[in-house]
Amino acid sequence: MIAALDARPGLAGQLREKIAELAAQVRREPGCLTFTAYEARDVPGRFYLYEVYASAAAFAEHLQTQPVHDFIAAVPALSTAQPGSLVQLDEITVG
């Protein structure tokens, strides 16, 4: 899954902190294989979250955790994220 978040003007630092808090919690979830956060070099305040889970069930469990609920509640005040800024992906098998 990839999520894109653009910080509201003047709130990039606060959004960055919320993302860091979320990452610290999510990385400890048993079904989380990868949770990496990035900030665009050319667009300060634009963040990308890259997440990989062991299974669809692990991702569903992740969505029910308190840190995720807290993050989702905080995002509207800090970000201009729109529907479609979250993309679920399936890996292409090579070989």
Q: Each predicted region: which residue ranges?
A:
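Short, well-ordered beta-strand segments in beta-rich or mixed alpha/beta enzyme
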Residues: M1-D6, T36-L63
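Solvent-exposed, non-membrane alpha-helical residues enriched in polar/charged side chains
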Residues: A4, A20, A24, A60, ...
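Short amphipathic alpha-helical segments
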Residues: L11-L33, P67
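A beta-strand edge to alpha-helix "cap/lid" segment located at domain peripheries
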Residues: A20, R28, L63, D70, ...
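Long, charge-enriched, surface-exposed interaction segments in small proteins/subunits
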Residues: Y48-Y50, L63-A77
